[in-house]
Design a protein with these regions (language model features):
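Rossmann-like S-adenosyl-L-methionine
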Residues: 1-192
């Protein structure tokens, strides 16, 4: 898929084994909303990155991006997309949300991270785009370490549950109607 955002274009590889934003017309508007809200971006930690639908277009807004995803097909396609687009500031790892929290807390070593210098990151933002089940308690705890949080949700019910648990201030919020005439909505929220 070739995606155009503002004055740039990206090729994002996908197949039927991975998730990608379903509404091609709203997708650039979602990216635009996120980029307009960014304040003082340094490095980005992204959980549930999928095949890179947000990773690739947001990479130019951050010094470095560390993107994690548990689906091996998604990570493989993301790595290929990074090469295809000649991006050098993105590192990836196949880690679940809980494994990412463990890795950042230095609770145990991961061979999958042996070539990644986690200490070199100066994370200013965390971006989460969880499945419909929402965030795990470990991810909620991890996110509290970050001043800025971008929460993308396809399930308003679990989003509301998580917002209460997070106890953060909502800076801005946008709702995208991905499937007209249905109850399915995509929420993008900036939290501090």
């Amino acid at each position: 898929v070739t995606c155009n955002f503002d004055d740039s274009s990206f090729k994002i590889l996908q197949n039927d084994l991975v998730f990608f934003q379903p509404n091609y017309y709203l997708y650039p508007l979602m990216i635009s909303f996120i980029t307009r809200q960014l304040k003082d971006p340094k490095d980005l930690l992204e959980l549930y990155c999928g095949c890179g639908g947000f990773t690739l277009p947001l990479a130019s807004k951050f010094n470095k991006v560390f993107a994690t995803e548990n689906n091996r097909h998604s990570i493989r396609l993301l790595k290929e997309s990074i090469e295809l687009n000649n991006l050098s500031n993105i590192e990836t790892a196949r880690l679940s949300d809980d494994e990412t929290a463990s890795a950042l807390a230095n609770e145990r070593p991961f061979r999958r991270l042996e070539n990644i210098d986690m200490q070199s990151y100066e994370f200013s933002h965390i971006l989460v785009d969880p499945p419909r089940a929402g965030l795990s308690d470990e991810t909620i705890s991890l996110s509290r370490q970050f001043k800025n949080m971008i929460y993308i949700s396809c399930n308003p019910e679990t989003f509301l549950r998580d917002i209460v648990k997070l106890g953060r201030k909502i800076e801005s919020i946008a709702i995208f109607d991905q499937f007209a005439n249905t109850k399915h909505l995509e929420v993008i929220c900036f939290l501090r």
